From Swiss-Prot:
GO terms for biological process: detection of chemical stimulus involved in sensory perception of smell. Gene3D superfamilies: Rhodopsin 7-helix transmembrane proteins (1.20.1070.10). Its main location: membrane. The chain crosses the membrane at residues 31-51, 57-77, 98-118, 140-160, 206-226, 245-265, 272-292. Residues 1-30, 78-97, 161-205, 266-271 are extracellular. Disulfide bonds join C97-C179. The gene is OR2AG2. Keywords: Cell membrane, Disulfide bond, G-protein coupled receptor, Glycoprotein, Membrane, Olfaction, Receptor, Sensory transduction, Transducer, Transmembrane, Transmembrane helix. One of its GO terms (cellular component) is plasma membrane. This is Olfactory receptor 2AG2. InterPro entries: GPCR_Rhodpsn, GPCR_Rhodpsn_7TM, Olfact_rcpt. One of its GO terms (molecular function) is G protein-coupled receptor activity. Belongs to the G-protein coupled receptor 1 family. The lineage of its organism: Eukaryota, Metazoa, Chordata, Craniata, Vertebrata. It is found in: Cell membrane.
Amino acid sequence: MELRNSTLGSGFILVGILNDSGSPELLYATFTILYMLALTSNGLLLLAITIEARLHMPMYLLLGQLSLMDLLFTSVVTPKALADFLRRENTISFGGCALQMFLALTMGSAEDLLLAFMAYDRYVAICHPLKYMTLMSPRVCWIMVATSWILASLIAIGHTMYTMHLPFCVSWEIRHLLCEIPPLLKLACADTSRYELIIYVTGVTFLLLPISAIVASYTLVLFTVLRMPSNEGRKKALVTCSSHLIVVGMFYGAATFMYVLPSSFHSPKQDNIISVFYTIVTPALNPLIYSLRNKEVMRALRRVLGKYILLAHSTL
């Protein structure tokens, strides 16, 4: 097949789920609501964790970072998808595609690592409460956050540079919601089998190892919770952990389907649907899952909203 020059002037056409659906208007309205929900809920959660002194704890610092990652992740993808649908213009420049891929990989990989650190935080809090402030000191917590961002950025840079240097064929139509590695490999006019093996190894390392750590952490947590004499303490621990497990299941399930399962196991249409879960649905639901099931967060949100409502009334 004829090759295309990979220059900044060359572009791709993103054929996302909005362009490949029988009811695009309904999907557009749903995505708009979910995006506004993600902006509002993650923004409020970040605000509450930042200004409420009672939430200046390792658990809530990690939760704030999760909200920040979700906010950035969905903003990398959703606004462009919605704007393209309205304009009936689905093109993305070569440079724009590379940037979107880098940012999406960074946010996704950082969240992947952060969720494992959050599981460790819950393990320490429940299984070793007397050592909590030593094992999860502010310094340790910030090291976890920095590790998530730095490792994710390095992985994203490497994969983005390699993928975007592949020779692409004349067909530039990406049947996907965003510029991502699997759909772009389908456009490459080169043998990508070795690179697909590298992606598989990276996927196993960055997805299955954190999942294993999370499962191990919560297995130990479960044994500890079952031995708790207080029903109230047992209930509080289970509520906190179940919230995290719901988030973990949604995120890792979709990411594993996309990056670990062989491409022969899923079609472009299935990939399109799955990408919606980790770019739009999960960022909108994560803060609700955490805040609605956490009394401390709900109290902090009410205090923050109350302050701003009073401030707004006093300025009128």
